[in-house]
């Protein structure tokens, strides 16, 4: 048995600071993260595998509408929800992903089904949805994913002919509404112009993810997202791209959040693993080099990582990232040596 088991989760990165998020909303996120970590801890304590744990952690994140994934997914320019998800097993490099799905309740479950029941890594759109139906996964009406807050973001983006990238748009919009309530004039920019390059590095991100080391020493990673508010119909980001939004092997597991196109261009998740394997860098050095030196030149965001020794790194180059981890001492029968931590800001 491995000396320790570890679960790390994130709920997205972006313009998340104490000046853009209310204390009440801060507590909602922290409690949600903690509860999901506790649920994952139970599975690990019962001898669950890393693959089962990351799937369940991400499924729970998808079920909570405060995150931009599953139930809380943002809307496209057409007023629809198009979700992406991916999962990877570090023990054998098997992976599965879905992209642009609109009626699958939990895209992460569909991603695992792709991994386990097809010879492919990625299915998209209607094909992915038909496959999910064939595997008796839960299918819902598109209206299931409607949330007023996300729809308000879309209306605002359309009204200003802009693109809002969660969590920035959500938190800054919340702050602006608060100012309007107090009859103040807000000068905070909540959106970015759609132009040749709509991915402004100052504004990002909405994704959820999990990485895990189980008691058997196995690693796994999973990521899920609704994308960005007012995105083009058919746009797919880094989340379902193996090596960009998610990666796991026998040394490390990584889940990304941030400027999707930047993570694809830098193959960020795989780059961390490659630096560790071929450059003999530590998890800390590799993850920080990618996020703080390489990624930042083309976009913003962060990653959560755990290596085969149970070391945890969660670097991000934005103002904040919803994140947390639980570390379980497998040599101790009770919980006295277990560690759980949740945080938002730097």
Swiss-Prot record:
Alphabetized UniProt keyword annotations: Autocatalytic cleavage, Hydrolase, Protease
Site (Cleavage): 206-207
Binding site for substrate: 235-238, 257-260
InterPro entries assigned to the protein according to its UniProt record, in alphabetical order: Ntn_hydrolases_N, Peptidase_T2
EC numbers, comma separated: 3.4.19.5, 3.5.1.1
Classification via Pfam families: Asparaginase_2
Top-level class of the enzyme under EC nomenclature: hydrolase
PTM (free text): Cleaved into an alpha and beta chain by autocatalysis; this activates the enzyme. The N-terminal residue of the beta subunit is responsible for the nucleophile hydrolase activity.
The protein's assembly and partners: Heterodimer of an alpha and beta chain produced by autocleavage.
Family: Belongs to the Ntn-hydrolases family.
Protein name per the record: Putative isoaspartyl peptidase/L-asparaginase
Organism for this UniProt entry: Dictyostelium discoideum
Lineage per the UniProt record: Eukaryota, Amoebozoa, Evosea, Eumycetozoa, Dictyostelia
